[in-house]
């Protein structure tokens, strides 16, 4: 932002059909990275390759065939009913006029996410969890190879957090797409992710499977928190114990 560098030397590769989570403390660059990938923010340099194609050089319409984006649940941008909100996701394929096939695609994702009953409801009147499902559905009908999600569980209670994360994990498997999400909750990231990228002050500190990234050492280094990390069903579980005073944020 302005003259300050938010991201520095960020490089990573992701295998297809994986659920990847970007974690880190406030200000680490998680959401900025997601927004740079989707070109909401313009990076000063570098490239973003999907199937060896650089999306930074594509038109918005062409890019939308490769990348879809789910904003935070607190963003309320659609003054329409749920069906029409989701139909907007077909824009890269249909222009402004939809066909019967496009409407069938909408009904398909409504059924997939079990929200058919909400089809004619006003988007702005839905609960936070329902809105998040609709935004995920909108991204799915876009039929992009990579789905980006910015804090998909923010402002949701624990039941709806699990509901949304289960949907994302199931969609990655069923649709064979890649999901990249910024997330605050380390336990959710550990339980659901195939791969985790841990950031601090705009740099990648660790990247790999949950067992190699979610460690007591990394949590102390990145979050300045002493934590006990235990294994449950071969996944790390984090129990924060105390803050580490005096260390630099």
Regions from the language model: what does each represent?
Residues 122-126, 130:
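Conserved ABC ATPase signature
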Residues 38:
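Helix-to-loop junction immediately C-terminal to a conserved catalytic motif
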């Amino acid at each position: 932002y302005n003259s300050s560098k938010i991201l520095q030397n960020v490089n990573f590769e992701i295998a297809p059909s994986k659920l990847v989570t970007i974690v880190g403390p406030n200000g680490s660059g998680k959401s900025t990275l997601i927004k740079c990938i989707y070109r909401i923010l313009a990076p000063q340099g570098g490239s973003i390759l999907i199937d060896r194609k650089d999306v930074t050089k594509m038109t918005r319409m062409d890019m939308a065939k490769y990348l879809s984006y789910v904003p935070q649940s607190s963003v309320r941008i659609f003054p329409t009913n749920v069906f029409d909100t989701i139909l907007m996701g077909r824009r890269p394929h249909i222009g402004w006029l939809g066909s019967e096939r496009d409407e069938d695609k909408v009904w398909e994702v409504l059924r997939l996410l079990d929200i058919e009953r909400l089809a004619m409801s006003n988007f702005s009147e839905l609960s936070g969890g329902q809105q998040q499902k609709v935004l995920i559905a909108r991204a799915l009908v876009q039929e992009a190879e990579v789905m980006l999600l910015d804090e998909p569980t923010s402002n949701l209670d624990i039941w709806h957090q699990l509901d949304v994360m289960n949907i994302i994990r199931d969609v990655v498997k069923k649709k064979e797409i890649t999901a990249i999400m910024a997330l605050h909750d380390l336990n959710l990231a550990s339980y659901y992710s195939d791969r985790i990228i841990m950031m601090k002050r705009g740099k990648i500190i660790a990247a790999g499977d949950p067992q190699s990234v979610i460690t007591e050492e990394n949590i102390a280094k990145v979050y300045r928190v002493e934590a006990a990390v235990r294994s449950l069903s071969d996944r790390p579980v984090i129990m924060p114990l105390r803050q580490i005073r005096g260390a630099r944020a």
